[in-house]
Amino acid sequence: MKKLFIGIVAVLILFSCGQSYEESKRLSKALRIKLAKEDSAALKIAVMPTLDCLPFYLAEDHNLFDTAVDIRLKHFTAQMDVDTAMMNRRVELAVTDLVRAERMIKQDSSIGYLTATNAYWQLITNRIARMTQLKHLEDKMLAMTRYSVTDMLGDLAVDSVKLKPEFVFRIQINDVNIRLKMLENNEMDALLLTEPQAAQARLLKHKVLLDTRSLDMKMGAVVMRNKEMTEKNRKRQLDVMIKGYNDACDSINKNGVAAYSDLVMKYCKVKKNTVESLKDIKFEKISVPRQHDIECARKWLSKK
């Protein structure tokens, strides 16, 4: 009798545990569906650990986006992953460069420009390699991302000193943090970086051989899905996002980048002295890219 009682109790316990597990599974599935619906309805922006994304970081962290509207930042460390998210409709907006933007637009005509950004790129050489001129890139490794502004600038650097392209070894390193780390560890001869990674490299006494600012090239951009932005809810989200972005630009221009060093350190993974070295950087409010910059990207892509 005692054994029978113990057996019944054991069965009841197992049955109870089974119910709890099934109930838990059901609730977890329901929660996942709920969260997926909320994420789908939100305005999602793909961002990178780069300084051109600072207005988005500031607007989110300092509640400059109207809280009545759901705006979410999606974080990536490689531009290719940003573009994949955009092409697969996992985000509605993406911070990118004009070369990658034009490549996306060619594949999907529903993608268009929201704004240019203040991003600029520098070709930086490892101080140990002792390269003082672009012609010294011969037989050296250059880190970049294919079909991006860094790829285009690599061509520009090589062509400007009439080097044979096959004598400069292009190494595709998509993650900007890994690219910088390879320079710091002396695993790369040269690379193309934007801020704040470029500033950290400069503080380590690595040499700048090319700067898009001196070439009058403004290649940073934010793209969006044009058709979706005409829908009532999306348009409202976009209007709120634009206001928050512009307000963030005003704040940065008034207070300076260093005033938001905590945000740059948090999202870009650089040191405080790196942020403090970034002086006189201004952020423009929403304005479309210049046509001749777009044409520059198109012309380069047409040869690929």
Annotate each language-model stretch with its function.
Residues K2-I8:
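Sec-dependent signal peptide recognition
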Residues F15-S16:
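C-terminal motif of bacterial Sec signal peptides marking the signal peptidase cleavage site
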Residues Q19-R26, Y147-F169, V240-K279:
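Ligand-binding clefts/hinges and TM-proximal coupling segments of bilobed small-molecule sensing domains
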Residues Y21-A30, L35-A41, L51, A190, ...:
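An extracytoplasmic/periplasmic, membrane-proximal ligand-sensing/linker region
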Residues Y21-K164, R170-I171, M182, D189-E195, ...:
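Short, glycine-/small- and polar/acidic-enriched structural segments
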Residues L43-K44, D139-M144, K227-R234, N246-N253, ...:
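Second-shell loop/turn segments in exported
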Residues L98-R100, F167-V264:
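Pocket-lining segment of extracytoplasmic ligand-binding domains
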